[in-house]
Amino acid sequence: MTFQNKKILVAGLGGTGISMIAYLRKNGAEVAAYDAELKPERVSQIGKMFDGLVFYTGRLKDALSNGFDILALSPGISERQPDIEAFKRNGGRVLGDIELLADIVNRRGDKVIAITGSNGKTTVTSLVGYLCIKCGLDTVIAGNIGAPVLEAELQREGKKADVWVLELSSFQLENTESLRPTAATVLNISEDHLDRYDDLLDYAHTKAKIFRGDGVQVLNADDAFCRAMKRAGREVKWFSLEYEADFWLERETGRLKQGNEDLIATQDIPLQGLHNATNVMAAVALCEAVGLPREALLEHVKTFQGLPHRVEKIGEKNGVVFIDDSKGTNVGATAAAIAGLQNPLFVILGGMGKGQDFTPLRDALAGKAKGVFLIGVDAPQIRRDLDGCDLNMTDCATLEEAVQKAYAQAEAGDIVLLSPACASFDMFKGYAHRSEVFIGAFKAL
């Protein structure tokens, strides 16, 4: 796929949209940016990142009338709207960042493990990524978890990966046609996003697009929608809590089995709960499909506590717990981290915002955060977006200062959470370096 001199409109200016602008401009496209609502400070912020970028706002129809060849959609924008359907009828092409990545990995030959489902996909993606890393593969974990895929690709500067582990939402799959995963799963289907789809079957059909190509299908035998996704002539691995399948739970003994072969006791799996038994079965099946050895996979399952720098407890001092989520580089990841923690929180936010809107954090922080500490170049924007939501916000010149001030205010039972919702490159070499500084500041208390 060539973009040289193509006129492309990128719609939606969150993290995914920003990554598409960066990738497409690097590859010679004439790119413009669109968002239905654009504040002047947002235009200024993004304009500093991309010299000469043209912005459109208001009606998408008006923006599309300027002779664009391609519309690159962020996942939050449905292509099922009249303006976009008319654009396609008139010969325009619509795609998203996953389709752009598919073109890259198809040409380069990277293996891909793709994961979707109504529930459990983040856990399975994290576990699969962890297992691949522990087995020595050069692994990229991206998509609906962590960094947008093109941001991850740009950071790698074109270097081939052993495997991409992608969490994909139905929104991301809508305009993805060329992805051919080495192995893929739909974990389950339940009612979700029905404000965007005609009905549950329409939603399931969108999820099933993950199975294009001839890769291994990993399917939930207990879910009627998933059973219907089996494709003729394809290798299929079934997992089940109810039946004897390729991977199944022997309830009498509490052990996971592969056919007649004993695999692992559920009590040896750090992830608690019956639903996580299905997640482990799916993860092992996916990893075996890219050639990883079963014995090693099962040993590493026993040590899985979550990805490094992703909601990871690093220590405790005088009853105050410190949690590192430096890999939380976008608003969605930070909101999820906050939602998963029950104790009162002091949250450290900030860095390079990548043009994101931080207002969704207002609801996430409400009733849970006792204070917010702001660092980095986009701290002023975060303060503006959170203004008026009854939060005590403190500006800090360094991450070390934020850690010290958070600890000074915290009481036993509180949590100090680093989950910046931002990229790190304004102050650090990367999210891992940011994590190192956070850990160092904790140890220095």
Curated annotation (Swiss-Prot):
- Annotated EC: 6.3.2.9
Q: What UniProt keywords apply to this chain's record, in alphabetical order? A: ATP-binding, Cell cycle, Cell division, Cell shape, Cell wall biogenesis/degradation, Cytoplasm, Ligase, Nucleotide-binding, Peptidoglycan synthesis
Q: What is the main EC category here?
A: ligase
Catalytic activity from the UniProt record: UDP-N-acetyl-alpha-D-muramoyl-L-alanine + D-glutamate + ATP = UDP-N-acetyl-alpha-D-muramoyl-L-alanyl-D-glutamate + ADP + phosphate + H(+)
Q: Name one GO biological process term.
A: cell division
The GO cellular component terms are: cytoplasm
Note the SUPFAM superfamilies from the entry.
MurCD N-terminal domain, MurD-like peptide ligases, catalytic domain, MurD-like peptide ligases, peptide-binding domain
Q: Which pathway, metabolic or otherwise, does it act in?
A: Cell wall biogenesis; peptidoglycan biosynthesis
Q: List the disulfide bonds.
A: none
Q: What is its main location?
A: cytoplasm
Recorded GO MF terms: ATP binding; UDP-N-acetylmuramoylalanine-D-glutamate ligase activity
The entry's localization annotation reads: Cytoplasm
Q: Which Pfam families match?
A: Mur_ligase_C (PF02875), Mur_ligase_M (PF08245), MurD-like_N (PF21799)
The record's section on Gene3D superfamilies has:
Mur ligase, C-terminal domain, Mur-like, catalytic domain, NAD(P)-binding Rossmann-like Domain
Q: Which family does it belong to?
A: Belongs to the MurCDEF family.
Instruction: Describe the task this protein carries out.
Output: Cell wall formation. Catalyzes the addition of glutamate to the nucleotide precursor UDP-N-acetylmuramoyl-L-alanine (UMA).
Q: What is this protein called?
A: UDP-N-acetylmuramoylalanine--D-glutamate ligase
Please spell out the taxonomic lineage of the organism that makes this protein. Answer: Bacteria, Pseudomonadati, Pseudomonadota, Betaproteobacteria, Neisseriales
Q: Which gene encodes it?
A: murD
